[in-house]
Design a protein with these regions (language model features):
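Substrate-gating cap/lid alpha-helix
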Residues: 51-90, 115
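The substrate-binding groove and active-site-proximal loops of carbohydrate-active enzymes
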Residues: 13-22, 58-66, 103-111
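Aromatic/hydrophobic pocket-lining residues that form the small-molecule binding cavity
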Residues: 23, 27, 71, 113
């Protein structure tokens, strides 16, 4: 579906919905399809936001960190393989630290969506400008 459009930027915020093994299994094939169908498109990878209840749910906190590490590793490997238009955004400051950005430590509230959007906006804007050159 994405390859039927002509986007300037693709924002990849999928980490909350995949495991590290799923990421490793599928990312290179996905990237080759995007590169083939939409050459030159800017791609922004975004980490899973920190899990605010990690101190109480160690398993979930570890899963988030493992997923983010898998994304960082995949990003580095894709860059080494020659994918040029890749960008990476750490998520540690996107939601703030007051605990008001999620309903349950994971799913965003209206405030969480607002903070997330405001956090990624400058990066996406810069990538759109870069793509328009």
């Amino acid at each position: 579906l994405m390859t039927h459009r002509n986007p300037s930027v693709i924002v990849m915020d999928f980490i909350p919905n995949v495991s590290a093994s799923m990421l490793n299994e599928r990312i290179e094939r996905f990237m080759s399809i995007i590169e083939d169908k939409i050459p030159g498109v800017q791609i922004l990878f975004i980490e899973h936001v920190p899990f605010p209840l990690a101190e109480f749910n160690l398993k979930k906190g570890e899963w988030v960190e493992e997923s983010n590490e898998a994304l960082r590793k995949a990003f580095r490997e894709l860059k080494k393989k020659g994918y040029q238009n890749l960008h990476y955004l750490k998520s540690e400051h996107l939601l703030g630290e007051d605990g008001e950005s999620t309903v349950d430590g994971e799913h965003f509230t209206d405030l969480g969506f607002d903070r997330f959007a405001k956090g990624i906006y400058p990066v996406v804007k810069k990538l759109i400008r870069h793509a328009e050159r």
